[in-house]
């Protein structure tokens, strides 16, 4: 059952209060395409009065554009027997997504590219009286079992690195005191009620272990009791905002209502769509300083189609050129924009320069000048 939105009583209020005027403000309104069982925003509040979209915010320098890259880590439909029923195919897919080879590949990728993606070699800046270089990241995963797999793999690899060079990695997911595991599809309410989901014993044990590692990193004393977990969540959130944590591995937390100007990168290994996708991406595009010119999104799932759909729904079908920076491949090889205009890439421009101003002529003239001076 989808959760009741906070504005679900609006129609009741309108019936009782005949002269009531309601103004609804929403960053990601509910349309027919993304209702998921809810009423649309228009059916509750009426016709939209004004739209201020991501395009406007970027052009007004209120937020940054995104740079999105897609990394194929699993073959899609052709890998799975279409004759199987949905439940069996889902099991096959889960096994492939949680395979040790895939987890190892993605973990290695993040560790090898972390400093580059989070700009650790950029010019230092001051935050809360501290001098910092670069930014930090969130790693969004599909499920608690996936968080567990990744955390174990990261810890195993970090143990082989000198302590001074290790990333500070933390995980957080919510549970209830009983053993009834519930759906983690919705991101609503997790921050307000961190005990909404129950955990199996193995999941609870790993969370305890991760909190213990966190305590060792920051000389704290949190635990997974009801009060202890709430305090852990608050401290975790604060350290993420202050860039004391390098990487937070999560399932659904910190995707809505969490703003950290030091957070520039989102690694994604989960399905996202419509408002959930834009809310997750938008954790990375807050303005801090000149070193940050875009929000950095690295997808280990094929989210390109869902990304385009979300942008078209909440902004404009032609917004892509404003909201998303071109890929490195486009800048290297050239591209054709939405209006059909061709833009030459770096490689083609370099060839043109070499043809017009060959280095052989430069070397010959330099040699001649040198000979004149020595003769």
What is each stretch, according to the model?
Residues 1-92, 103-107, 255-325:
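Signature of the SF2 helicase/ATPase Hel1-core->accessory helical subdomain module
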Residues 3, 43-44, 57, 93-103, ...:
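Hydrophobic alpha-helical scaffolding
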Residues 4, 22, 63, 116-123, ...:
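Intrinsically disordered or highly flexible coil/loop and linker segments, enriched in small
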Residues 9, 50, 102, 106, ...:
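Alpha-helical structural motif
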Residues 28, 72, 141, 366-372:
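Conserved coupling segment at the C-terminus of the helicase ATP-binding
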Residues 30, 142-145, 171-182, 299-309, ...:
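Short, conserved secondary-structure transition motifs
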Residues 95-250:
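Conserved C-terminal RecA-like helicase domain
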Residues 288-375:
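Long, hydrophobic alpha-helical segments
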């Amino acid at each position: 059952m989808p959760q009741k939105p906070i504005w679900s009583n609006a129609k009741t209020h309108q019936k009782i209060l005949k002269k009531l005027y309601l103004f609804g403000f929403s960053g990601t309104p509910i349309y027919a395409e993304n209702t998921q069982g809810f009423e649309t925003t228009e059916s509750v509040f009426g016709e939209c009065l004004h739209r201020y979209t991501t395009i406007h915010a970027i052009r007004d320098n209120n937020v940054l554009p995104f740079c999105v890259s897609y990394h194929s880590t699993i073959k899609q439909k052709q890998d799975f027997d279409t004759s199987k029923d949905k439940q069996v195919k889902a099991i096959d897919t889960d096994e492939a997504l949680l395979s040790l080879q895939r987890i190892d590949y993605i973990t290695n990728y993040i560790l090898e590219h972390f400093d580059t993606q989070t700009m650790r070699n950029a010019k230092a800046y001051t935050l809360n009286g501290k001098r910092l270089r670069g930014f930090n990241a969130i790693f969004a995963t599909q499920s608690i079992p996936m968080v567990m797999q990744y955390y174990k793999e990261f810890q195993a690899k970090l143990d082989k690195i000198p302590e001074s060079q290790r990333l500070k990695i933390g995980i957080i997911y919510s549970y209830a005191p009983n053993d009834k595991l519930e759906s983690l599809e919705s991101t609503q309410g997790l921050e307000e009620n961190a005990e909404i989901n129950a955990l199996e014993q193995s999941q609870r044990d790993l969370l305890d272990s991760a909190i213990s590692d966190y305590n060792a990193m920051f000389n704290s004393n949190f635990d997974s009791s009801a009060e202890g977990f709430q305090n852990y969540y608050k401290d975790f959130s604060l350290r993420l905002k202050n860039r004391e944590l390098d990487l937070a591995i999560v399932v659904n937390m910190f995707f809505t209502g969490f703003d950290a100007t030091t957070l520039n990168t989102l690694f994604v290994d989960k399905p996202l769509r419509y408002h959930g996708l834009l809310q997750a991406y938008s954790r990375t595009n807050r303005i801090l300083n000149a070193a940050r010119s875009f929000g950095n999104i690295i997808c280990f799932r094929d989210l390109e189609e869902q990304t385009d759909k979300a942008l078209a729904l909440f902004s404009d079908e032609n917004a892509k050129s404003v909201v998303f920076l071109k890929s490195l491949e486009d800048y290297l090889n050239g591209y054709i924009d939405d209006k059909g205009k061709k833009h030459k890439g770096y490689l083609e421009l370099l060839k043109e320069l070499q043809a017009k101003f060959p280095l052989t002529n430069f070397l010959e003239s330099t040699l001649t000048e040198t000979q004149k001076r020595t003769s």
